Swiss-Prot record:
Family: Belongs to the LpxK family.
Gene (UniProt): lpxK
Name the UniProt record assigns to this protein: Tetraacyldisaccharide 4'-kinase
Pfam families named in the record: LpxK (PF02606)
First-tier enzyme category under EC: transferase
PANTHER family: TETRAACYLDISACCHARIDE 4'-KINASE, TETRAACYLDISACCHARIDE 4'-KINASE, MITOCHONDRIAL-RELATED
SUPFAM superfamilies: P-loop containing nucleoside triphosphate hydrolases
Binding site residues for ATP: 53-60
Record EC number: 2.7.1.130
Species per Swiss-Prot/TrEMBL record: Bartonella bacilliformis (strain ATCC 35685 / KC583 / Herrer 020/F12,63)
Keyword entries, A-Z: ATP-binding, Kinase, Lipid A biosynthesis, Lipid biosynthesis, Lipid metabolism, Nucleotide-binding, Transferase
């Protein structure tokens, strides 16, 4: 079953949001109590990359660039992920040669190209397995609100355009827990998007004493894009961001098709997309994350004129990742010495 985030989450509070407020109060109370629990501790530095809201914010590319930076510092990072949509049970180490998105989830498969990834609903058990494999740094992909593993540092990612939506807690809005609870337990915020669009994010950070950092997504295409016209399709948290990124590198998006996040395309879906593109003489464009799900069903063989887009990040502070990792390790050492 695929569920897309409702549009009213990302607008000013509506009548529907008002009607759902009683349910939000109950959910928010439970979420706050859950975040107050004492999590299990592992003898490794732990950096959590999370977000305030349900839906895509850009966590996966952040974890990837942090993995790359950690390796340049001589570390062996391991990534803990729940593995949304996985079918494998227990703790599982992702193997890019043998696993596919259907079995382990699309995001873990992307992450496994850059670091060892353990998926499990039990994040502590996954971290233990990574430690057994020789990892000396844990990067936790999501899990900030669940408190299933002690974290030395929590970096929360915000999409500059969407921000916190209407500012309400689920189901009246996109917040995973009351904002004041999340702000009190996180360490810093990374706003992803154009700098001008990040301005409104300053408002809810001001006065917290927490730092705010900036980055923007830089698209990487599998083929030349400039001057080509596209039918772009995606089943990710925020497909509009992907469509806009094609225009940023001089591609022309003529038509778009959006699907729910983590959606597994069918033969009929791709047949329809190919027909639309052929009629209009367009190239097809999709994300690397979507492509892992297409490959999982071996549907990529018959697709012609398809360009796959990956992303990296450009940080306002060039040394952001290295400084962050050094802070995480320093906090871990302080925690260890205080025992």
């Amino acid at each position: 079953m695929y569920i897309s985030a409702p549009h009213f989450w990302w607008k000013n509070k509506s009548f529907l949001s008002f009607l759902l407020t009683p349910f939000s109060k109950v959910y928010g109370y439970c979420a706050r109590r859950g975040m107050e629990r004492k999590p299990p501790v592992i003898d490794l530095p732990v950096l959590c990359v999370g977000n305030f809201t349900l839906g895509g914010a850009g966590k996966t590319p952040v974890v990837i660039v942090l993995s790359q930076a950690a390796k340049k510092l001589g570390l062996k990072p391991g990534v803990v992920s729940r593995g949304y949509g996985r079918t494998v049970k227990g703790v599982h180490l992702v193997d890019v040669e043998c696993d596919d998105a259907y079995h382990v989830g699309d995001e873990p498969l992307l992450l496994a190209r850059h670091a060892l990834v353990a998926i499990s609903p039990d994040r502590y058990a996954a971290a233990k397995r990574l430690k057994e494999e020789g990892c000396d740094l844990i990067l936790m992909d999501d899990g900030f609100q669940s408190r299933r593993l002690y974290m030395d540092y929590a970096l929360l990612v915000v999409d500059a355009m969407r921000g916190l939506g209407n500012g309400a807690v689920f189901p009246a809005g996109p917040l995973r827990a009351p904002l004041e609870t999340q702000l009190s337990l996180m360490d810093s915020v990374l706003c992803i998007g154009h700098l001008k669009a990040c301005n409104h994010v300053d408002a809810f950070i001001t006065g917290t004493g927490k730092s705010l950092h900036y980055a923007h997504l830089k698209p990487l295409a599998s083929d030349e894009v400039s001057g080509k016209s596209f039918l772009a399709f995606a089943g990710i948290g925020n497909p509009d961001k992907f469509f806009e990124s094609i225009e940023e590198i001089s591609g022309h998006v003529i038509e778009t098709c959006s699907y729910p996040d983590h959606y597994f395309f069918t033969d009929a879906d791709l047949k329809n997309l190919k027909q639309k593109a052929k009629i209009q003489n367009l190239w097809l464009a999709t994300t690397a994350k979507d492509y892992t799900r297409i490959q999982a069903k071996a549907l990529q063989k018959d697709i012609e004129n398809l360009i796959v887009f990956d992303v990296t990040l450009d940080f306002a502070q060039a040394d952001f990742c290295y400084r962050l990792l050094e802070e995480v390790i320093a906090r871990f050492k302080k925690r260890k010495h205080s025992l």
